[in-house]
């Protein structure tokens, strides 16, 4: 998905620690780049990308609620500024901060229990109105189709890399 400024986002919600490994984050970041440009297009046209893993537990293990991963020029400690960002959010950390309350909201099943009025209203619309239920069914169908397409593409790429195709 893209925002109004053209930044591209891939939000991955991971229940299992194995699904949120650093190399998987790198893979998703590279996948976004590969799907941004056409052959012959200038590399300066690459979009700013954000891969966001929302995880059930603190998969990086430093006890923080959020981790911003970026590349650095090691010799001088400067940011590399390739506009590629990876963020890990520990949804298990549900303290009384803005992020902590948002993580609490993500775990709520009932719109009445959600702190954010905007999110509560949208959850109510999606879960408790016929229009919302219809919309969610269409969205789930699209997500399924996109996942199947992505899986097929990844499988072909892996088969080619392994010399099996």
List each language-model region with its residue ranges.
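Short, charged alpha-helical interaction segments and adjacent helix-coil junctions
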Residues: 2, 9-14, 94, 99-165
């Amino acid at each position: 998905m893209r925002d109004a400024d053209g930044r591209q986002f891939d939000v991955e919600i991971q229940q299992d620690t194995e699904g949120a490994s650093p190399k998987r984050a790198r893979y998703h970041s590279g996948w976004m780049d590969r799907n941004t440009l056409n052959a012959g297009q200038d590399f300066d046209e690459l979009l700013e990308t954000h891969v966001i893993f929302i995880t059930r537990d603190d998969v990086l293990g430093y006890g923080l609620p959020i981790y911003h991963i970026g590349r650095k020029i090691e010799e001088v400690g400067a940011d590399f500024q390739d506009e590629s960002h990876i963020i890990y959010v520990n949804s298990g950390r549900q303290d009384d901060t803005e992020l902590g309350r948002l993580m609490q909201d993500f775990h709520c099943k009932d719109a009445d229990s959600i702190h954010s009025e905007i999110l509560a209203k949208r959850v109510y619309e999606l879960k408790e109105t016929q229009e919302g239920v219809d919309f969610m069914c269409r969205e789930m169908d699209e997500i399924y189709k996109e996942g199947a397409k992505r899986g097929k593409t990844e499988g072909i790429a892996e088969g080619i890399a392994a010399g099996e195709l």
